């Protein structure tokens, strides 16, 4: 069982809208997972929600704009900010600066690890199916090699 995970040795997933570097797979924990998100200037993932997940983001670098729920005004995010996304809440973050927006994301599963998607790869395959993305193109060209 692993207790310490390196942010230097990650598996990279390059979605059409952002990068996720997997730090701790949900299969290695009871009810959480950890990854680093990188958005290039102008990038934003699609508006989406996670019905079974509460997310916590810690902004490491860059500038962003959070759209969340039914809020009419977006929220600015900057290094040092912590963002909370409640379960079943539509959200997305835009990179609005001239440099990449990078944040550490911790997904917490209040009901335990999702049975339908027990690993990060199974989750990525489901996301790709919903968005119409090719899984093989999302996994880093080097086969998801450790960076």
Regions found by a protein language model. Give the residues of each.
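A short, N-terminal "cap"/entry segment at the start of jelly-roll beta-barrel domains
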Residues: 1-32, 46, 118-147
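A generic "binding-loop/recognition-motif" signal
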Residues: 19, 43, 52-53, 71, ...
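Conserved hydrophobic/aromatic beta-strand scaffold that supports enzyme active sites
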Residues: 34-38, 56, 74, 82-84, ...
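Conserved short histidine dyad/triad with adjacent acidic residue
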Residues: 35-51
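Residue-level recognition of conserved beta-strand positions in structured domain cores
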Residues: 36, 49, 60, 68-70, ...
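Histidine-centered metal-chelating micro-motifs
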Residues: 44-46, 65, 73, 83, ...
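A short beta-strand-loop-beta hairpin characteristic of the jelly-roll/cupin
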Residues: 54-79
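Ligand-binding loop in jelly-roll beta-barrel domains
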Residues: 79, 87-114
């Amino acid at each position: 069982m692993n207790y310490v995970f390196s942010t230097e040795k990650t598996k990279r997933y390059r979605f059409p809208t952002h990068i996720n570097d997997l730090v701790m797979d949900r299969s290695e924990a009871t009810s959480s997972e950890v990854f680093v998100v990188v958005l290039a200037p102008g990038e934003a993932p699609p508006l989406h929600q996670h019905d079974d997940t509460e997310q916590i983001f810690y902004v490491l670098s860059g500038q962003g704009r959070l759209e969340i729920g039914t809020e009419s005004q977006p929220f600015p995010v900057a290094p040092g900010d912590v963002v909370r996304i409640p379960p079943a809440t539509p959200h997305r973050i835009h990179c609005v600066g001239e440099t990449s927006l990078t944040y550490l994301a911790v997904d917490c599963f209040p009901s335990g690890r999702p049975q339908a998607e027990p690993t990060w790869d199974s989750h990525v395959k489901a996301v790709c199916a919903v968005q119409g993305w090719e899984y093989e193109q999302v996994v880093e060209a080097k086969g998801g090699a450790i960076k």
